[in-house]
Amino acid sequence: MLCGVEILCSVVAVVARVLGRALMTICSPKFSTAGLIGSPTTAWGGGGAKKKVHMESEKQQLPPPPSPPALVLPAFKRNCTDQEQRAPATSTKAARGRPPRLVIPAAAPVAVARGGVDPFGGRETDVATETEVKGEGFCLASRRGVRHAMEDGYGVITRHKIEGGSQLAFYGVYDGHGGRAAVDFVADKLGKNVVTAAAAATTMSRHQAAGSSSPSQQRREEEDDVTAAIRAAYLTTDSEFLSQGVRGGACAATALVKDGELYVSNVGDCRAVLGSRGGVATALTSDHTPGREDERLRIESTGGYVSCGGSGVWRVQDSLAVSRAFGDAGVKQWVTCEPETARVSLAADGDCRFLVLASDGLWCKVSNQEAVDAVAAAAAAAAGVAGSTDPCKELAAMARSRGSRDDITVMVVDLQPFLPV
């Protein structure tokens, strides 16, 4: 009997020691519930977003642990490569006390209009991706780039009658940057302003010159007045856009045809190239870039500076890669909207066949002569220069296959209907 009691006491003592150790372990602050009780686990996804994965216990759940400190990312000064950020400015102005660098933030995504029927009877498969238009005497193809929403645009006005029986036709290709606000405004306003100003200048010039000068002198004065009217229309459009206080900008290449005269104007790096019957390409515009010597001197003479980063791209105030454009209020002191205009007499040069207007998404990969050759070849297989959109589509495809990542817009204008009979 005594022996049985001793054994029972020993068992109770052992159990007590085990329970005591267990209680000490549970009460210790070093004890971890991981793997024992289903507490929330936080996994960090890309961009600093938190994703909660729950493993719930059927019986009990401890409160979640304290949230980790917020992840703070450094602010980016401008949208360029690390190599370009490190590259020193090579301009002569850069070495001397230049103004502080201007920061132009990247544009937020902009909703793009849905596809539909083009007013010229063309087909718009998806405005955000591609546009194809076959209109009266012209064709167009546009392809969105891979970096952002489509920022190219175009405008066409045909059969605009003015006093004296003359008719005007206007064609334009536009390349926006910093969002769609500027390119949409320019596409809507510039053509109307150019046609209105040119018509008014023609009428006034004819009234003033009536009976006071020879026909040849009168014609020269009228041509000068039309050129001045185009300039005024560009500057007026720019002023109207700036008055809205909206950010962004746009480049342009436009053509006005009147009485057998072709007036081609541009700001920025949109380009116009003339194709002859003999297949010769002639550039009628010169790209406005900070790397152009006369543009650099103009900018520096007004207190600005230009620089070239590691990517080889020249920029105004370390920000903008074109030296003339609509909009761009932050650098307007140096980035003017003063157009350069070239005039070609279609009557005197009956060799003119077509005109190629395009954004720099084409010209960065396709040469002037290649563009003319492609249009001529496609026109030979189709019903004339503007008989289909094939010439424009082939040029856009050529630029894309060679690595162009920008928006590409190509317009081909048939000049033969404007030649004198």
Swiss-Prot record:
Sequence ranges assigned to domain PPM-type phosphatase in this UniProt record: 137-415
Sequence positions that bind Mn(2+) 1: D175, G176
Alphabetized GO MF terms: metal ion binding; protein serine/threonine phosphatase activity
SMART domains reported in the protein's UniProt record: PP2C_SIG, PP2Cc
Keyword Hydrolase on entry: yes
Keywords from the named record: Hydrolase, Magnesium, Manganese, Metal-binding, Protein phosphatase
Single biological process term from Gene Ontology: signal transduction
Cofactor, free-text remark: Binds 2 magnesium or manganese ions per subunit.
InterPro entries documented for this protein: PP2C, PP2C_BS, PPM-type-like_dom_sf, PPM-type_phosphatase-like_dom
Requisite cofactors: Mg(2+); Mn(2+)
Reactions mediated catalytically: O-phospho-L-seryl-[protein] + H2O = L-seryl-[protein] + phosphate; O-phospho-L-threonyl-[protein] + H2O = L-threonyl-[protein] + phosphate
CDD domains the UniProt entry points to: PP2Cc
Pfam families documented for this protein: PP2C
Documented EC number(s): 3.1.3.16
Signal peptide boundaries: none
UniProt region (Disordered), positions on chain: 46-69, 203-225
Positions bound to Mn(2+) 2: D175, D360, D406
UniProt record similarity statement: Belongs to the PP2C family.
PANTHER family (alphabetical): PROTEIN PHOSPHATASE
Name of the protein in question: Probable protein phosphatase 2C 77
